[in-house]
């Protein structure tokens, strides 16, 4: 009998149906419960997992590592200086080699095409830990966190504030509308999402009964908001744009004034982290000295407020990544969803 997930890669939200995405979220909640109760779930006993990182990471690396170990697998970290992807060796050749040695591959880097080539040529499941276009494992964690707080997803409204063109905004739009969540992008016109991404999300919204709003008007954006979400103003690889982004995005900061506009005491705040909410880092101090900004995408007040759920969200990276790896590699009996 055909298994729904076995042997499949997890590269972008658009590759999955609503039912499949919901299944992975609910499976993650189940695995989280098993973890909390100390019940072993070694679905990947004896498996070897390659963790390829072109981009640095705290949460993605920690989540994949602990998830693999909890599932009984052995994770092997290969950083930017350990692999030859596209430099001394083609991605195709690297994929074919790694596919002979590992049972599954995680990739976190710049190019979506690269993770797709790894999946095409390795012969094993490949999981996208982040590319410049999509961040699908983050979405499972995000929407699990939302569901934990509201008991549902359909009909809720999520507002993303900031750079509407980045991978997180892309993924929130597509995954949210796929799941029946209304997604608002609150961003300057210069950073509105790409038209093809918006059209894709609108197609999902039509099917799920959700809606999409892209606006630079704060009152319009937060009307009916259940979730406020933000991300860093400058993505990895765009560090030369700091001054421009600080000036452009300051009006889109998540602060208490914006929270109050939403007029929802049950509102939650999410951030995929790291967050620049104070000057308690070398990075934060440097930005404050150069640009006179001590709080960037979110104020410290909101970050530490009763609305904040970002550390729950970060923990959920592990549980949702575990669900993806187990479902695609664990030979689990999932004939339909």
From Swiss-Prot:
Chain residues that bind L-ornithine: 167, 231, 235-236
Catalytic activity: carbamoyl phosphate + L-ornithine = L-citrulline + phosphate + H(+)
Recorded superkingdom: Bacteria
Enzyme class: transferase
GO cellular component: cytoplasm
Record key words, sorted: Arginine metabolism, Cytoplasm, Transferase
Subcellular localization(s) per the UniProt record: Cytoplasm
Binding site for carbamoyl phosphate: 57-60, 84, 108, 135-138, 272-273, 317
Protein name: Ornithine carbamoyltransferase
Organism of this sequence: Streptococcus equi subsp. equi (strain 4047)
Name of encoding gene: arcB
